């Protein structure tokens, strides 16, 4: 049988398709380099995230005045007027599931420290409507001062990334501790006790 040009072209095409279908293998060195590059990118990404989480974690706490809900006595609370006390500022919202989980713990801590007079627990309602906020306060039997963060002035000053977030302000007016998630009564009480001891 003689070989025609058509048979050669068909064979060449089949060989070319086979060559294209065969996966290319990476050398072990290339794999190691890729792993190192990905690890470095991960570390850099985490550092960027931490750098952008710029909540105050020390130094003077941003001052503010909060209008307290009428259902909790009304009036205002100004941070700078309460120097000499440990102030626990909890940012929350009625639509926040983790906030609902920690609400009983916050009330428990307030009941434990309220009579001392040198500890204040303050709730700052974040991006919420008054009706839902008041229903939340009633549902959890909250008695410590709470008010709406009108125009997100306070949460902006504290660079809130989400809720719940809690700041413990020392007697000197500086941020003593920042808590980036829900908190238990036991953990919060331990932080307050350390702040009181300073």
What residues fall within each predicted segment?
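Soluble periplasmic/extracytoplasmic beta-strand elements of cell-envelope proteins
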Residues: 87-90, 121-125, 167, 178-179
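N-terminal targeting signals for export/organelle localization
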Residues: 1-67, 198
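Short loop/turn microsegments at loop-to-beta-strand junctions
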Residues: 62, 87, 163-164
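Short active-site neighborhood of thiol/selenol oxidoreductases, capturing the structured segment around
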Residues: 77-100, 121
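Thiol/disulfide oxidoreductase modules built on the thioredoxin-like
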Residues: 135-143, 148-197
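Conserved hydrophobic/aromatic "anchor" residues
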Residues: 64, 77, 91-92, 136, ...
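Structural microenvironment flanking redox-active thiols in thiol-disulfide oxidoreductases
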Residues: 100-140, 150-157, 190
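A short beta-strand-turn-helix
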Residues: 65-87, 110-113
């Amino acid at each position: 049988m003689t070989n025609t040009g058509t048979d050669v072209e068909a064979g060449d095409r089949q060989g070319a398709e086979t060559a294209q279908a065969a996966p290319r293998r990476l050398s072990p060195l290339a794999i190691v380099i890729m792993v190192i590059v990905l690890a470095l990118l991960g570390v850099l990404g985490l550092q960027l995230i931490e750098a952008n989480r710029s909540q105050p974690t020390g130094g003077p706490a941003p001052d503010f005045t909060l209008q307290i809900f009428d259902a909790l006595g009304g009036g205002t609370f100004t941070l700078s007027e309460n120097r000499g006390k440990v102030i626990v500022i909890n940012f929350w919202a009625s639509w926040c599931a983790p906030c609902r989980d920690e609400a009983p713990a916050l009330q428990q801590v307030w009941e434990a420290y309220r009579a001392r007079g040198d500890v204040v627990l303050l709730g700052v309602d974040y991006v919420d409507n008054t009706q839902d906020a008041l229903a939340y306060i009633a549902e959890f039997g909250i008695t410590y001062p709470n008010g709406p963060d009108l125009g997100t002035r306070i949460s902006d000053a504290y660079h809130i990334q989400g809720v719940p977030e809690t700041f413990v302000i020392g007697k000197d007016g500086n941020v003593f501790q920042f808590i980036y998630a829900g908190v238990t009564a036991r953990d919060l009480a331990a932080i307050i006790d350390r702040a009181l001891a300073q």
